[in-house]
Amino acid sequence: VCFSAEEACECLDKLRKDFSELVVEEYIKGADATCFLLGNQDKYVVDEVLLVKHHEKLFFDKEVIEMADHAEKRTQYIMAKDALSESVIEEIKGISKNAARTLHVRDIVRFDYRVTAENCIFFLEANTVPRVSDTSELGFICNYYKWNYSDILAQYIDSIIARINRD
């Protein structure tokens, strides 16, 4: 993370020596939200918004969460309803369902967002092949609601079959 244009230029000059392509993003202060959808637009089996906690923080003003943080369990999920208003959660769900429909995503998807202190929602990315395990977002959701993980996976497969038969 660079904190000035000069610092960014210096960093870019160094990176250009090793990489032919670079992605530069503006850092947005806020909370990391993820919306996990399982199913299809006629019936979502799972439709849940989670927040990511890192070093006991929900709101980030300069931190960058890396893959290693997730792999080494330095992050935790919490239910969005424990920190965000119902209207913000419903807006995230609506944006996610609209994006899934627009992008023709089927069966499973995870959309990531940054939510500012003013409740502005910024779309970060769509993950059309999110990790499915009992320690991933889906596992957290199942544990929270005391759902049987195998039953949810069976519903996931049923959703795929129903879509295939419909298409």
Stretches found by the model and what they are:
Residues S85-D167:
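ATP-dependent carboxylate activation and anion-phosphoryl transfer catalytic cores
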Residues F3-S87, F122:
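Phosphate-binding site of ATP-dependent enzymes
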